[in-house]
């Protein structure tokens, strides 16, 4: 194992983050998507592939049908996923997987069969010498320098609140919220339509995602912000589309991410992220709640909105017992903190005995993943 640096691959619903253990940021960050030509005939004779991965698929999005093999944080299309991993090794990192240990990440409460399938593909298709599967939220907590806390991890496909005590996730208290970046993008498309701007295709949706990432923010006081927006143009701002047209966006800027706190905006009967975190803490032993409230760690791209930590603090303070000290931590690198945690973990000397080796896999089969990764 020692002679080659381990690889860390964080497979998110929206983006794949990959790189080398011990480095402080991923080398490759690309969309977790596969594009297939809409019409076979157009592409004839251009030496075209039957499938494009990542950025290349994104750049040809006008003539491709785009599909994401990871839905709500969980791999649903294994053939496409294998293509993404192949692309990661050979095109993005330019390494031979048979020479490197690979640390993969998984969603909390990932079905057992899924971890087994990941293990099988790594050893049998890619012939890796060693691998490990770690829970995303736990890695984010490590990256923040903690071993106890509650992580609100919200990416493109799913959000989770994961209480962690002394390095171990507490499965009975993990809550999943099927509301994340992709839903916010959809909602922004919908409310921009009310303004008369129409975005329909998968290509136009990527434009809306960009608007969301660049211009949206979370209001500290939603009602107050709505009132302010109706009385003045203080929140109005403009965005230039790829064709040069300029659109104006106003209260949509904070109405869009407000869905995280009020899922009923999109017709979802679910608790908002603040209430989900509160409920998660409530499922934990009373003796550790204080440690969780004082270490609420945000992670994932959908927690990148300006104002989220302040709003989260306000909402949790209103729900928690009065004497409780609440601290919400929003590390600046939280978009990549899962990957960073994986980079830290896989380069620790104490971790080297934790790898599942190819020999162990030969002996025990894919069930070994449940014994060695928890």
Swiss-Prot record:
It comes from the Eukaryota. It is found in: Cytoplasm, Cytoskeleton. GO terms for molecular function: ATP binding; hydrolase activity. Its main location: cytoplasm. It catalyses: ATP + H2O = ADP + phosphate + H(+). SMART domains: ACTIN. Its EC number is 3.6.4.-. GO terms for cellular component: cytoplasm; cytoskeleton. Keywords: ATP-binding, Cytoplasm, Cytoskeleton, Hydrolase, Nucleotide-binding. CDD domains: ASKHA_NBD_actin. Pfam families: Actin. Actins are highly conserved proteins that are involved in various types of cell motility and are ubiquitously expressed in all eukaryotic cells. Belongs to the actin family. This is Actin-1. It comes from Naegleria pringsheimi (Amoeba). The lineage of its organism: Eukaryota, Discoba, Heterolobosea, Tetramitia, Eutetramitia. The gene is ACT1.
């Amino acid at each position: 194992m020692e002679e080659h640096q381990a690889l860390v691959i964080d497979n998110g619903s929206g983006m794949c983050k990959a790189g080398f253990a011990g480095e402080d940021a991923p080398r490759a960050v690309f969309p977790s998507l596969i594009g297939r030509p809409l019409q076979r005939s157009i592409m004839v004779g251009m030496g075209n592939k039957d499938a494009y991965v990542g950025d290349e698929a994104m750049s040809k999005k006008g003539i491709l049908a785009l599909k994401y093999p990871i839905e709500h944080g969980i791999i649903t299309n294994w053939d496409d996923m294998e293509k993404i991993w192949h692309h990661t090794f050979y095109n993005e990192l330019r390494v031979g997987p048979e020479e490197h240990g690979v640390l993969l990440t998984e969603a909390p409460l990932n079905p057992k069969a899924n971890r087994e399938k990941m293990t099988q593909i790594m050893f049998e298709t890619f012939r890796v010498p060693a691998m490990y599967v770690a829970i995303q939220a736990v890695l984010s907590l490590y990256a923040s320098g903690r071993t106890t806390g509650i992580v609100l991890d919200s990416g493109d496909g799913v959000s989770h609140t994961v209480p962690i005590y002394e390095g171990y996730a507490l499965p009975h208290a993990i809550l999943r919220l099927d509301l994340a970046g992709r839903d916010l993008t959809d909602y922004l498309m919908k409310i921009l339509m009310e303004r008369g701007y129409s975005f329909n295709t998968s290509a136009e949706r990527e434009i809306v995602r960009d608007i969301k990432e660049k211009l949206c923010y979370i209001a500290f006081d939603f009602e107050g912000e709505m009132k302010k927006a109706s009385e003045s143009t203080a929140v109005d701002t403009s965005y230039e589309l790829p064709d040069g047209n300029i659109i104006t966006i106003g209260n949509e800027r904070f109405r869009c991410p407000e869905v995280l706190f009020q899922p009923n905006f999109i017709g979802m009967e679910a608790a908002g992220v603040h209430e989900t975190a509160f409920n998660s803490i409530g499922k934990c032993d009373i003796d550790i709640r204080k440690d969780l409230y004082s270490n609420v760690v945000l992670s994932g791209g959908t927690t990148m909105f300006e104002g989220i930590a302040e709003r989260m603090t306000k909402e949790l303070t209103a729900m928690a017992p009065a004497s409780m000290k609440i601290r919400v931590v929003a590390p600046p690198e939280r978009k990549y903190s899962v990957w960073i945690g994986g980079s830290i973990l896989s380069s620790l000397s104490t971790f080297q005995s934790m790898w599942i080796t190819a020999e162990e896999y030969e002996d025990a089969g894919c069930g070994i993943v449940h014994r060695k990764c928890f």
